[in-house]
């Protein structure tokens, strides 16, 4: 239960942290952009960080598995068959999952098994997943912008000194 809660809270908290780091240091000239684009950019960068972290830790998990089991397993079969890759992909990267499954089904129907499918999978995850989270984060940012604009009172008072 705690793992499930943490897995759903980690991406928004990471986006929140990345957003504030980007705005504090004005990276990518983010302060000149509209609010929804700032949130979208933070979401895309957060996706890149999360995917890279997952793939690196999956590789470390493979190394531990090889050391403990004494088997010679390649990274591709280990990633697709023995890790939480598909579960996390279907939850967080739906567009990339559909693209990967579509590509694999087309290749299977054609009877082709080209080399480098793991690299193609990583490319699809990075491109499609980042675009998905860019637009999803942008949509959430636009909704938040509308919400915050609705909270304003409408009468713009001059700023008074509080002391």
Which sequence ranges carry the predicted segments?
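Membrane-helix boundary/juxtamembrane interface motif
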Residues: 2-157, 162
